């Protein structure tokens, strides 16, 4: 049996509060606080409510369906998949306000520790590139060969032919992956933007795509890193370089 069983879905009027620890807005519903995807603090929305049962426990999540009172910081999300794949949470929020929300979230977390309450939090360093920066993608593969993402709330599979966050090389590889029907349900694609090195796992046995590499190499500020397939590596290479330069300065 699927670990996550959908019980029912409905619609409700919600008044959105703060951003929660998972990145979604928080709203009160039936006496409890729930996460609502696609909102901005202060908005009044009609949301689609999803009730789930997981391991004998009940959970409730929501997705904005209609905005009644819109925030001044709301913008049109540039990605056609936004809201369906749920990989991006804040494309509907003006970028400058995104940075303010991130800073506020860090301050809120620090307040939970007496030893960190007085620590001064600097403004968030804006990314030089809001799109085409990710050096790592993990795609889901359906039996019919379609490649894409799974909506984290509805668990519905969303076929994707282009992801605005990924480097052009990863998107080119994504196009090649469509409909080759590999014998796997997950594919990991990684790319070194400063070296041109790449990794596709698992081995696909397809001549058009080099795959099965155990690692790839990336250059950060003159330092070569050997990144294994399961290893963590900062997905925004340019920001990682800027961070290392700040630490060393």
Predicted regions and their residues:
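Accessory RNA-recognition modules of RNA-modification enzymes
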Residues: 1-249
């Amino acid at each position: 049996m699927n670990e996550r069983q959908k019980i029912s879905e409905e619609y409700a009027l919600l008044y959105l509060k703060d951003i929660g620890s998972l990145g979604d807005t928080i709203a009160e519903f039936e006496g409890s606080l729930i996460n609502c995807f696609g909102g901005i603090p202060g908005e009044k929305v009609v949301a689609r409510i999803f009730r789930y049962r997981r391991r004998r426990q009940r959970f409730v999540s929501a997705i904005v369906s209609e905005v009644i009172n819109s925030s001044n910081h709301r913008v049109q999300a540039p990605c056609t998949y936004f809201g369906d794949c749920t990989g991006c949470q804040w494309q509907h929020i003006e970028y400058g306000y995104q940075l303010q929300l991130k800073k506020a979230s860090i301050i809120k977390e620090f307040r939970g520790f007496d030893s960190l309450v007085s620590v001064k939090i600097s403004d968030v360093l804006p990314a030089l590139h809001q799109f085409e920066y990710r050096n790592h993608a993990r795609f889901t593969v359906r039996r019919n060969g379609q490649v894409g993402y799974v909506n984290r709330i509805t668990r519905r599979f969303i076929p994707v032919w282009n992801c605005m966050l990924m480097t052009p090389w990863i998107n080119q590889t994504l196009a090649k992956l469509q409909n080759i029907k590999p014998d796997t349900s997950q594919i990991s694609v990684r790319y070194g933007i400063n070296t041109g090195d790449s990794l596709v796992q698992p081995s696909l046995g397809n001549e058009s795509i080099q795959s099965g590499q155990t690692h790839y190499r990336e250059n950060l500020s003159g330092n070569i890193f050997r990144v294994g397939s399961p290893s963590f590596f900062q997905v925004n290479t340019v920001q990682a370089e800027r961070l290392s330069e700040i630490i060393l300065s």
